[in-house]
Design a protein with these regions (language model features):
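N-terminal lobe of the biotin/lipoate ligase/transferase fold
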Residues: 1-87, 91, 109, 116, ...
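A generic fold-level signal
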Residues: 26-27, 53, 96, 121, ...
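Long, positively charged amphipathic alpha-helical accessory segments at protein N-termini or as interdomain linkers
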Residues: 66-68, 75-93, 103-240
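Conserved active-site carboxylates
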Residues: 100
Length: 240
């Protein structure tokens, strides 16, 4: 499996590296993993805190030709990570729609999917995964220390990043390539793990509050405002 993983000591961004790599041809899927990112990217153009040696920073490159529902890519990747945290780290996690994995005291993982178009057609998905492995909450920048956590903080244990990385990639392969689950099973599993269902949530793009009631068959967040129901497929959603 190691020939399907590129390990880097340092890179500007695994996503930028993967972007160039996927356009150059070669067998997929493949993962780009770095020990340190100088320009790690998060959602909405924000930087992603990725200090040297403390986390898993990777981009998994997927050919989308056999992916039926593109909107489920991030959802499926979140399930892959959550299962490994449960099986390898003995941690029960929840999923904060659309792209965060939460533990009891905060966010431990963020997932960012970017679709790459070639000659007018969506050809690749770059699935960025960042996991806070070692360190304590006080080690984070002031603006995120109250909402972030690490595997070490939660368990008091040190985890082998290489083993953890390879287990996650193996599970991504099982879900995306070997079709470990049907799309319906993926959605049902994520519903069970959802941190948002049956709660009031604030949708920033709408600038208003809704009540989260379900996850749609294509991974959208189903919300209710009075008697009106709608499905949100992108944007930022926070707990009210």
């Amino acid at each position: 499996m190691n020939d399907k993983i590129i390990y880097l000591d340092e890179v500007d961004s695994t996503n930028l590296y993967a972007d160039k790599l996927c356009r150059s041809g070669g067998e997929l899927p493949i993962a780009v993993v770095a020990d340190f990112q100088t320009k790690g990217s998060g959602r909405m153009g924000r930087s992603f805190h990725s200090p040297k040696g403390t986390g898993i920073y990777m981009t998994y490159i997927l050919d989308t030709q056999n992916i039926e529902t593109l909107n489920l890519i991030t959802t499926s990747a979140g399930l892959a990570v959550a299962e490994v945290l449960e099986e390898y780290c003995s941690l029960i996690s929840s999923v904060k729609w659309p792209n965060d994995i939460l533990l009891s005291s905060g966010k431990v993982c963020g997932i960012l999917t970017r679709l790459i178009t070639v000659e007018g057609k969506i050809k690749f998905a770059l699935i960025g995964i960042g996991i806070n492995v070692s360190g304590k909450k006080q080690d984070f920048p002031e603006e995120i220390k109250d909402i972030a956590t690490t595997l070490e903080e939660e368990t008091g244990k040190a985890f082998n990043k290489k083993i953890l990385t390879e287990k996650i990639i193996e599970n991504l392969n099982e879900i995306f390539i070997n079709k470990k689950y049907t799309e319906k099973q993926i959605v049902e599993d994520v519903k069970k793990r959802s941190a948002m269902l049956n709660k009031n949530v604030f949708v920033k793009g709408e600038n208003r509050e809704f009540f989260a009631v379900d996850i749609s068959s294509d991974g959208g967040l189903v919300v209710r405002d009075g008697g009106e129901m709608k499905v949100i497929h992108s944007g930022e959603v926070e707990f009210s």
